[in-house]
Amino acid sequence: MANIKVFALGGLGENGKNMYIVEVDEHIFILDAGLKYPDIDMYGVDAVIADMTYLVENKDRIEGVFVSHGHEDHINALPYLLKQIPTRIYGTHFTISLIENLLSDNKMNIKHFKLFRINENKVLGFGDVSVSFFNTSHSIPESVGIAIHTKDGSIVYCTDFNFGPTNYGKYQTSFDKIIDLSKKKVLALLTESIGSGAIDRIKNDSLLEHSYKNILLNMKGRIIISAYSSDLSR
């Protein structure tokens, strides 16, 4: 039987600073590496990241960072991590592109780092352990769930997702792969809980177009619209 440990360095019981660790025997897998913006009473603090001391002390056992998507609370601690641990980073094409921009903004040469683009058909092997992926729907393109497969069963990581329909059909949840995972032995499901208490159905993004048209056509004054830079479809 494999010696399996699962714990969070950040993101558990808080919104942001996502970083989860899965250990399988001698292998360490890092799931996401994000930051958290400070509370209003944390004066002089620009961002909060997880304590990475344990990872630095065990850096020779780390197989890489497996990134679910490109939001700041899931990737923006990577520059701090990579300065201490030059490990491999795995993510979808769009996510890795965001990480490349992030590293460049931090004056870090992307050629010095091991950035690997994956898709949901990619399976990575690390001795007796393998890692697979499945597409999820989110407010950012190319988000994925991650499954770590051991000889005793799988640990499935699926954060920040929804099952709502989208108006950009390229990015959809892979229900077939989720069904395949459910047919195998799943030891643990690590999933997001924000919004889980809401009883309302998620609204289709295409409904925004109708709302905006009404506002734009009837408003006589100035209209200011905020946008989230990574939310390309909206």
Give each language-model segment a name.
Residues 1-66, 71-234:
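His/Asp/Glu-rich metal-coordinating catalytic cores
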